[in-house]
Amino acid sequence: MIGKITRRAIFTVVLSCAAASCHLASAASPVLPPPATDESAAPGAALRTAVVAGGCFWGIQDVFEHVKGVVSATSGYAGGTAATAHYEIVSSGTTEHAESVQITYDPTKITYGQLLRVFLTVGHDPTELNRQGPDTGVQYRSVIFYRDAEQQRVAEAYLQQLREAKAFPRPIVTRVAPLPAFYQAEGYHQDYARRHPNDLYIVYNDAPKVTHLQQEFPELYR
């Protein structure tokens, strides 16, 4: 993983290239159709959680913190073991972890399928294999981690729906996988985009995602 200091250095040197890639990243994903299959929730249903991975967790966390119905979004690691759930180890790309975000949401206000629609439209590019933007490695892979059979059913059905509709010009590489556990990332990673809005990495890679969310999903933006 490219560390924070390295990221800043790269984006200072290649500012114009980063600006171009930022606009490309924010505009590349089409607005996707709603999922034909979704979860159900009775009035007064308890809060639920979803875990997704797709590139650096800073930007995905920031996106979902701007979505109505989301109670919290937490950066962390999923796919590996507790022993390797540490930034310096995960960043080596030698663990089974992916940088992930756990989303706690109110299912009476937003559905699991709607969260996936946001994730696949503005959260990241689901056609990028083991990378997102300037970040490369298996720890940046695109994954929907499911907690139960209903989440698995919704995720697999939605990806199949998008493939059949040829919603993207390239094949979708997002995997659907069971969630063994979610491990919260170090404190300095939490709310990084909100706390460091002028960080060049945030400015050129993550802030445009929030703008895209506001433009394409005004009914969900807060």
Model regions: which residues?
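N-terminal export leaders
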Residues: 6-11
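Flexible coil/turn and secondary-structure edge motifs
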Residues: 2-5, 17, 21-222
